[in-house]
Amino acid sequence: MMEGQQHGEQLKRGLKNRHIQLIALGGAIGTGLFLGSASVIQSAGPGIILGYAIAGFIAFLIMRQLGEMVVEEPVAGSFSHFAYKYWGSFAGFASGWNYWVLYVLVAMAELTAVGKYIQFWYPEIPTWVSAAVFFVVINAINLTNVKVFGEMEFWFAIIKVISVVAMIIFGGWLLFSGNGGPQATVSNLWDQGGFLPHGFTGLVMMMAIIMFSFGGLELVGITAAEADNPEQSIPKATNQVIYRILIFYIGSLAVLLSLMPWTRVTADTSPFVLIFHELGDTFVANALNIVVLTAALSVYNSCVYCNSRMLFGLAQQGNAPKALASVDKRGVPVNTILVSALVTALCVLINYLAPESAFGLLMALVVSALVINWAMISLAHMKFRRAKQEQGVVTRFPALLYPLGNWICLLFMAAVLVIMLMTPGMAISVYLIPVWLIVLGIGYLFKEKTAKAVKAH
């Protein structure tokens, strides 16, 4: 373990097991559930519950694959390290940069959502103004130290978790006590055109947006380098997070869709806030809007942390400028936080230029980057496992269903891309994947050329 203050190129270990569990949980309870679920409900109806169960299973397989690797070798930069070591230098380079871009895009989507939530109270404030204000505040906090991040994220996540549990209990009470009015009945789950009102197709077409909700679970891997005891904390966090996610997602959506017919949900408001607003409970609606706002800020906070650590890892591998591989005397990678913030600031511009379509566009781009990310975790894990078997090493936290689980995940990713190609407004993000891979290829060649030139001198 690293004790005391480190200078130069060491991150400071300051995250406890409670921090790691809640960082992962906080990463997943965010805008995907609170805002993204609205468009899924419109298309899939109550079948959204089945969709979340399927995506949750895939996310769990991915988490266990990453978990197996991280427990054996806990390092900064998380799985790009494994892609590098077990797959090849381009795979490491590409996965690292893709992960960084993924979380920059997630950060942009969350800041956009913050703007939408503020409009619930102040419709006249443009989304770009709210995005700009919270952008400055959260980045300033992250420039303090990792303990502050851990504590802030811990309390952000606690608020979210308690609120979702309270909403499930309160919603359940409204439902079974009769206080929710005549429209609040469990039969809403199958009476309004059936459990799958638009058939299985309606659900399948929404799997990409559902997948957006599960992006963030891999944060467990990123926290490994700053965990006090990765061998114990990572397996514990990985296993417990998935049960909680299923309770929170499936439980909250089942209660929500029983309180009011799904047909009354609109796309641009959080269904959680809308339903209590419709029930005439303005206090609960306002309280829930505070919660969904906290949720978005919490995920954005995780993104700022995650981006800076990923970029730090890339710099240590020699895949990003060396200046980014330094930390200040408190163990904070200031340079990487500032560079990530600079790129994320584009979100303010996107919201200024296209306030209506900003969230949908960013969500589609996130899913494309997430597909690449999860596919690379699964492929890197297969290579990692083969290498360990050849060395005769028995890993301490084996992934589930290897290698079948890996193939199930890869088929799921391919299906999500096909669905996105068929979805208006999302296809563009799939067409950008080959463009992005070409950009990564050029970046990699430039890096190799520079490295050779330095060696020659």
For each predicted feature, which ranges?
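TM-loop-TM module centered on a large, flexible mid-protein loop between adjacent transmembrane helices
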Residues: 81-84, 88, 120, 206, ...
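Helix-loop-helix junctions that connect adjacent transmembrane segments
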Residues: 6-11, 48-49, 122-126, 158-290
